[in-house]
Amino acid sequence: MGCGPSQPAEDRRRVRAPKKGWKEEFKADVSVPHTGENCSPRMEAALTKNTVDIAEGLEQVQMGSLPGTISENSPSPSERNRRVNSDLVTNGLINKPQSLESRERQKSSDILEELIVQGIIQSHSKVFRNGESYDVTLTTTEKPLRKPPSRLKKLKIKKQVKDFTMKDIEEKMEAAEERRKTKEEEIRKRLRSDRLLPSANHSDSAELDGAEVAFAKGLQRVRSAGFEPSDLQGGKPLKRKKSKCDATLIDRNESDESFGVVESDMSYNQADDIVY
């Protein structure tokens, strides 16, 4: 009978035809006839087994190459994540999960290191009683620093306190003596001027006294030479009535005598005042 009747069963076992759109190089050869002359039953079984294994391997490769495909033997997503994390941890690419406190500390330390590298914060600081002081270093590679102006130098020199020497003390003593002498001279000049003023006043007063004496003498002469008519017929002196004008003139004369002023005696010799 031979291998003839076993050919259709073997062909049925080989079937898994590729789907549409797959590559042609992975297609299974189903059209190859197996004759009884060229193969034995053992060889046929081995061939069928090899062809089935090859077809399954090709299917797995093709399914894995396509995006979004999941094979029957593929692991679950949780197992894949575990494997990936374990591989990364072993390679040192990912750190182990840490607590929030350790993460915050690490971030703050990184920030401090960056600030120190930039020069904003300095690592070493000297603490004093009154406060803190930092050592600031400036890089003067671009331009050299200029000297401060002379005005600042003068101010610094003024602020410095000098020790007193004997020469300074002697100079101060001499200056004090000169001031004392000048003050004494000024006082003497004032005293001399005050002494000269009363002598001038005394001479003026003497002149005034002489003039007053002369005026007094003149007044006495005028009074002694006053006109007093006598009655030639009866030998009696004529009487004169005093008028208001005479009273006012007498009062004026008295007041003028107090001031050293004398009026003329023309008013005494008036014809109206004589009574016959």
Swiss-Prot record:
Where along the chain is composition biased (Polar residues)? 68-78, 87-100
In this UniProt entry, which cysteines form S-S bonds? none
Q: What are the SLD domain coordinates in residue numbering?
A: 118-244
Q: Where is the lipid attached (N-myristoyl glycine)?
A: 2
Keyword tags: Lipoprotein, Myristate
| Region spans: Disordered | 1-40, 61-106, 226-250
GO BP annotations of the record are: regulation of microtubule polymerization or depolymerization
InterPro entries the UniProt entry points to = Stathmin_fam, Stathmin_sf
Q: Which domain of life is it from?
A: Eukaryota
Q: What is this protein called?
A: Stathmin domain-containing protein 1
The protein's organism comes out as: Homo sapiens
